[in-house]
């Protein structure tokens, strides 16, 4: 566990993820989601003097933690960029095709969820923001204030998998005509009233809040770009380890890996000659999807939805 500004963060699948990377003492590794440094610190403990670790994060608080770690350990560097941009960063550093392993631990962190001022949670009232990097893009409040009802409904349905998306979006638009939304608790209450069928054990605003967060941070677009960039950065034999926390993320990861296991055979023209390499897999998948153990779930209930998938680059 690491402590950050009074908010606890327990790194999910810590040992399992780093073990899956198969860290070599002299290897070069990327932590695409530094967070509070749980995975990075364990990776560094396995690296020798010649090993290197490059961390990425959009969150200014995570970057501050990373800079403190970099000051302690010269083998580590952290940059304030999305992992979707890791291809550019790796190229600028002359590391394209030379990376030994990439780790992506997706989603929102506990410090982000638990800090009311970040605006991610409906449980703790705060400004309706939800941005991983509060200095870039539009906040959730700005999106809610300006988007057409159809767009809000799409975000709730497509990214939040909310079946009452239309009804909830209309309630949001009707209320904003009277008074704009500025606080998370205010929005959560309107969504709660508009949701006619509450799921047992789940706040009725859960799915809509997830949809807003994913949209505001372009999480799925970043994931698709980041997976492609990660693969290109890896050397042959390098590992890609991805931990996802909801079905939309995991579906993207699973389909990405399945496609590369097949090579390019699914996208070839019919009745035309093709190169043999088109049928050669680009990766191999290591094992089945892995989930948190009972012991980890007991210590950290937020790990219940975590799914880890591992691939190795073949060519």
Swiss-Prot record:
Role this protein plays: Specifically methylates the N4 position of cytidine in position 1402 (C1402) of 16S rRNA.
Species this chain originates from: Pseudomonas fluorescens (strain ATCC BAA-477 / NRRL B-23932 / Pf-5)
Protein name as annotated: Ribosomal RNA small subunit methyltransferase H
Pfam families: Methyltransf_5 (PF01795)
Annotated GO biological process: rRNA base methylation
Gene: rsmH
MF terms in GO: rRNA (cytosine-N4-)-methyltransferase activity
Keywords assigned by UniProt, alphabetized: Cytoplasm, Methyltransferase, rRNA processing, S-adenosyl-L-methionine, Transferase
Cellular component terms (Gene Ontology): cytoplasm
